[in-house]
């Protein structure tokens, strides 16, 4: 299965991209501040030493959300910055923290096609069963994006194939791509065969 090309945004447009991604959040409350926390800004800029100094100062809240409820780890996931993600997790942040729309860091990484960060979060024990506000799990999103690189990774990591979103759809039901459907069916058949052999 070939990987799906995902458009990457250069670092100069990171803040603008953030604002566009969260534009819907502004509609929740006209009085809600849209000012980005300083730690979030530092993570967007991608300077690990600056982020480390801020965290080590003890003057920042590692679980603070922006106006959309995105925590620092969500931002590290969006930027694909493993060094920052590692440091945040080592400081005890919640790997499965949810924003205002139920999105966890691994869901953010999947949406952005941040393959290495997804693998990193899996290695640290991210929950693959948690869905967003629409109950879409990481595998649902990878299938929706037709991400041929992430789908095998998520399947191998044990993503639930029978998880249903709010439309009562399992991951295989959110695509019409025959190659993806065939791949998931073959994976499922192989897993079932392996389980049968283990039971003998």
Curated annotation (Swiss-Prot):
Pfam family, one: Ank
Sequence segments annotated as region (Disordered): 1-34
Bias type Low complexity, positions: 9-34
Segments annotated as ANK repeats: 34-62, 68-97, 101-130, 134-163
Record bears the keyword Repeat: yes
Keywords for the protein's UniProt record, in alphabetical order: ANK repeat, Repeat
SMART domains from the UniProt entry: ANK
Protein's recorded name: Ankyrin repeat-containing protein DDB_G0279043
């Amino acid at each position: 299965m070939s990987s799906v090309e995902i458009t990457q945004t250069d670092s100069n447009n990171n803040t603008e991209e953030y604002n566009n991604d969260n534009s819907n959040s502004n509609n929740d409350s006209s009085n809600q501040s849209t000012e980005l926390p300083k730690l979030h800004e530092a993570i967007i800029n991608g300077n690990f030493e600056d982020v480390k100094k801020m965290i080590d100062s003890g003057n920042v809240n590692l679980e603070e959300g922006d106006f959309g409820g995105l925590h620092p780890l969500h931002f590290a996931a969006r930027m694909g910055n493993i060094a920052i993600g590692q440091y945040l997790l080592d400081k005890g942040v919640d790997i499965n923290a949810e924003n205002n729309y139920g999105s966890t860091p691994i869901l953010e990484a999947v949406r952005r096609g941040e393959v290495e960060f997804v693998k990193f979060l899996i290695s640290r024990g991210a929950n693959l069963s948690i869905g967003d506000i629409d109950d879409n799990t990481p595998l649902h999103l990878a299938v929706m994006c037709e991400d041929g690189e992430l789908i095998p990774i998520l399947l191998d990591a044990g993503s639930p194939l029978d998880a249903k979103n709010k439309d009562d759809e399992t991951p295989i039901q959110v695509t019409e791509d025959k190659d993806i459907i065939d791949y998931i069916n073959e994976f499922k058949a192989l897993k079932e065969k392996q389980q049968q052999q283990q039971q003998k």
